Amino acid sequence: MEDFIVISDDSGSESSAGTRSGRARRLRRALSRTPGALPRRTVDFIDLTRENRARTKDRNGLCVIDLTRNEEENRPIATLDLTLEPVASSQKEPTSLQTCTSLSGKEVMEAHEDRGSQPAAQRIINNDPVDLDLLEENLFEGSRPPTSISQDSVYPPEPNCSSITYKGDLSFLTSLQLSSDVSSFSSTSNQRASLPCPQQDVPCQSQGLLCPLQALSCPQTASPCPPRASSCPPQALSCPPQALSCPSQTLQCQLQALPQPPQEVPCSTQNVPCPQQNMPSTPQGLSWHPRHTLYPYQDTLGLPQDVPGRPQNMSYPQDVTQLQDMPWSLHDMPLSLQDVLQSLQDVPPLLGDVPPSPEVMQLPGYVTQTSRDVIQSPAGVTQSLGSMMQSPGSVTQSLRSVMQSSGSVTQSLRSVMQSSGSVTQSLRSVMQSSGSVMQSPGGVTQSLRSVTQSPGGVMQSPGGVMQSPRDVMQSPRDVMQSPRDVMQSPRGVTQSLGSMMQSPGGVMQSLRSVMQSSGGVTQSLRSVMQSPGGVMQSPGGVTQSPRGMIKSPGMMLSPGDVIQSLNSVPQSSRDRMQSAGHVPSASGDAIQSPGGMSPTSRDRMQSPGGVSLATEDSIQLPGGVPLSSDVIQSQGGVPLSSKDRMQSPGGVPPSSGDMIQSQGGVPQSLGDAIQSAGGVPQSSGDAIQSPGGVSLATGDSIQLPGGVPLSSGDVIQSQGGVPRSSRDRMQSPGGVPPSSGGVIQSPGGVSPASGDAIQSPGSVLPASGDAIQSAGGVLLASGDAIQSPRSVPQSPSGTLRSPGNMSESLGDTPNLSGDVSNSPQALLDLARDRPKSSPNDVQNRDTPMDISASSSSSCSANPQSRQSEFKLDKVPWLTITDSSARREKSLPQLANPGSAQIQGQIPQVGVYNRPCLHRLKYFLRPPVHHLFFQTLIPDKDTRESKGQKLEPIPHRRLRMVTNTIEENFPLGTVQFLMDFVSPQHYPPREIVAHIVQKILLSGSETVDVLKEAYMLLMKIQQLHPANAKTVEWDWKLLTYVMEEEGQTLPGRVLFLRYVVQTLEDDFQQILRRQRQHLQQSIANTVLSCDKQPHNVRDVIKWLVKAVTENELTPPQDETQTSPRTGVLKTSSDHLSPRPNQNKNTNQLIVCQLQRMLSIAVEVDRTPTCSSNKIAEMMFGFVLDIPERSQREMFFTTMESHLLRCKVLEIIFLHSCETPTRLPLSLAQTLYFLNNSTSLLKCQSDKTQWQTWDELVEHLQFLLSSYQHVLREHLRSSVIDRKDLIIKRIKPKPQQGDDITVLDVEKQIEAFRSRLVHILGEPLVPQLQDKVHLLKLLLFYAADLNPDTEPASEH
């Protein structure tokens, strides 16, 4: 369709009237923020027609969105008021127009004469003026998720095109209502009802909660709808990009896709308040996407997506019905599971004003959310506690694609097609035409368990309202609420905890497999389903049982026992239901569904769209949106079983008692088997199957289609046809049912093995017993392997089939405690031998769920959850048929529960090696602990490749920062800057200086503020690294902090870390870009041995002071505790004694100062000369270190191996009676071994052997560092070193390195003799071990093999 939008602007005042030109013009920006500066420009028409004609405003000058298509009809269908001022009820637009409330939160109507006198209103988005010219281009970028639109920020003071996000709440959407103008579709009547919707009655959350767009359903009373009104044209269902130029137009699809309900139905929709409803408060905005999208996008308009928050109470305005309560056109035939095709005349519309239960969540137009974990996807995909998917335009969503035609709906597991004639459903695509529907409008069969009418407490009203004396709940209109968890779907679907299921075609499923036809109402003992076209209650009368009934005017839930049919349909003796013209179900507990689909009477529920829900706690939503406290059935023919079985659409019936007959005449026998439709496996016990191949376990599991997070329950099933069985078995896609107790015959004539075998679609036969075959390679639990919170037992035997051909035995699958269900996204822990999970085991977080990434993405944080490590979309089909072989393979996998996790977590080499290789090229030493080290290079490359122009933070935002500074509110200053600093915007130098000097180095700030300030500085350093011209600290400030009064500042260590970070980042930046300009670096300015040797001496002095101020601890204790205490310092400072606090602080300072010295060695491009100079300065300080433990700390923390070699060499040279002229080499080390004595002080009272032990230890340090110097080319300049390492140039042979085995043996023996002479025999074992280690190090350094080169003594 080549629809276009004609937008004309009003360049005059509001008083100007008359016909305006129809040529398209863009909205222009208001050039002044002062009120009344320029006349206000408003949208007159948004017309989707192709005819060129004069566009006239209504008499009040309101903006019109014309959705009409015929040229002869000049009356627009809907009016969207974009102005700020309401209009009085007396000044409504002509009767041919439908009014929508204005986007502001003010009154709906206001006198027309007042509008011209008010100041011009401007558009504001995100508190910034918006240029509507560019809003269209920016809206589809999707780079930033819009949050919401604030009530008080609809009109801007000044234009700004850069911001496309919405902040604040979406309360204006609450007031946006669509009145069903019945007469607008009729040529004989022009009457319409005014629908005032006061704003004060609708409290909205501030985080972008979308109040449902609701439409008053006023069915036609005179003549049937014309073809244009009966079905939505395809072009009306897709929102063109141009329609998104204003926020109100994004709802255009929903506004157009509302055909009127059948005629001859009374419209009693006025003044029916909707109870408050829970909505997740996830502040994620969602940008609009095309309607055919089945999976949630990253961004959708104002709808929470990935992370469901705690439910928020919301009240809805009166006289409002859901946009999707009217999905069926006059030609749509409601389809019930009983094969009943009810004509629209016999279908009572119960759509209007269905008050959802306190736990029901209604989203505008197409969003249905449950009280626990509902997630709405942009394409109308509703995700509920289990896994709900709602398509916006009464479009059922299938596993992969949904297709809606004007006439009817066809749902299949993989594709749903709606045609005008009827609803067709198939195992993969079953088409059911109106003629093929077997059920007549007059009769509803009821099972034996659901007695026709209970004598006590039954009230039958002409409207079919029944009440029971016990547990009766009456909802205002057609809402059936259960005492536990009732959920209302946008198409008037009520779902109760007792497993209420509503299918759009009027399908009702009962706990014992009750089915409701459009003409009649069947209610089961535990589950009731209500459809909008054929609500469970028939007009003739509904009987309610006296026990545990839930009564709604249009819907009756009889949890107790009774199901009353409209025309007194007889019940079968055992819960058997026979559909007309079809094969009766097997005796016992079999139920025959219309299209060959027979749900079991025991615990099965069949939804009309191929959606079957189990009883107990299942909830089925029409159009694939199921909600329930425990069981959730997904759309597209995905059945869910709360108890033991599931019936899939497409005619695959499971039998609870004895046999299940599938549509193809294939009987299925299962005690607890579950047949999924279209190859969607489902678990018998408590599994839940989602439409896109996503199966959810029962209990409280939640399946989210398309990456929506899961359930509070315990079982989580990921997409890709991965079912989880909570009880004993699961059916994999392909339509192969599993058999629980006997043989199960799949519709294709495939029979799985008896016992407990499960047949997977790809001719995969799982072994008998309790084996479970996962579809798509996802782990399936069988044999009661998964325990649902509803006390589903776990069987000790069974196998788990993991995606990567990993079968795991379910014998030790952990039980799921009932407490786990308390978490909205409780995860099933399938690790072997793990005890029952508790609420603490489950992360109580609303994490976004990516089903494509893992079977349960919430499990990713749980190391024992094995399902989270595998990509479902990349797992091949499992073809193992031998159960014993599979069990054998499962044992080693279970023995090593972390193996799967390790395999899943192997990083890609290219991604993680880049920073490491970068560091290796230049330093080959541990980098500074930069919080963003691995992202430094990608960010730099991205900025360079895009050529982004850096700009300072805008002046208006800086005013907010300066205000906090003036008010002495440092936390606000830091938080504002944290938000305002971005890759494109950098803070001014004076602001950074204020953060460093006035906040980080403040003596009065709390630890939290100091940490926030440090994180801000790290973010600025990451995005905009400082250089020699922009650095905001100098050596004078550093000296003050390290020496004078600054030693008592609480932010002293954080400041030192920031200083070292700036030195390191700037040094590496220059090495990457301008290697020949190291003299321009900050490090060269302050740490050059040639330019600033006194600064280097200061660093050495601070280093020795920090080392000697440490607590006197034994060497072994010091080496063991120092790293750990350093890590724990920040979290345990307030608990640790003061000495430990100082000790930890000193250790951190030592590491930072050592890093500064390692940089000082490199900055002058002459590492050998610089190391010699620094070693000379350091020698005197080292001799003054009193304790060995302190000297050990001094040498072990030294990062530069070249510097350590030089310092040790100077110490040994001064300790030798006869200094050697040998250069630093292996021969020099051998010389030191027998000619040096210890110059270092040792104040301990222990024996003299520790002095020699320290000398040997220093020789080991010397040998080790010397190897690093040779192999890493540390004597070469850092600029040349990169090429030497890349080319793998071997180090040049050094004079004095050509020692032999004989030389080593001789010198070691001479040293032993020397020790024996001084210390006496026997030598201390510790000293003997160190001498032997030194010998081995010498052999290794000289690349000698003592076995091949025997010594002279031998």
UniProtKB/Swiss-Prot annotation:
Region listing for Required for inhibition of CAPN3 protease activity, in residue ranges: 945-1354
Signal peptide: none
GO cellular component, one term: PML body
Keyword terms: Nucleus, Protease inhibitor
Domain of life, source organism: Eukaryota
Motif (SUMO interaction motif 2 (SIM)): 64-68
UniProt main location, coarse: nucleus
Region (Disordered): 1-34, 432-471, 530-770, 783-870, 1111-1142
Polar residues compositional bias, start-end: 445-455, 788-825, 1111-1130
Tissue specificity as recorded in UniProt: Skeletal muscle.
Gene Ontology molecular function: any one: peptidase inhibitor activity
Ranges where the record places region NSE5-like domain: 953-1288
Motif SUMO interaction motif 1 (SIM) in this chain: 45-49
Low complexity bias (residue ranges): 432-444, 732-752, 852-867
Biased composition (Basic residues): 22-31
Region (Interaction with SLF2): 864-1354
Localization of this protein: Nucleus, PML body
Biological role stated in the UniProt entry: Inhibits the protease activity of CAPN3. May play a role in SMC5-SMC6 complex recruitment for viral restriction. Forms a complex with SLF2 and this complex is required to recruit SMC5-SMC6 complex to PML nuclear bodies and sites of viral replication.
Known partners and oligomeric status: Forms a heterodimer with SLF2. Interacts (via SIM domains) with SUMO1 and SUMO2. Interacts with CAPN3 and CTBP1. Interacts with SMC6 and ZNF451.
Name this protein carries in UniProt: SUMO-interacting motif-containing protein 1
Species this chain originates from: Mus musculus (Mouse)
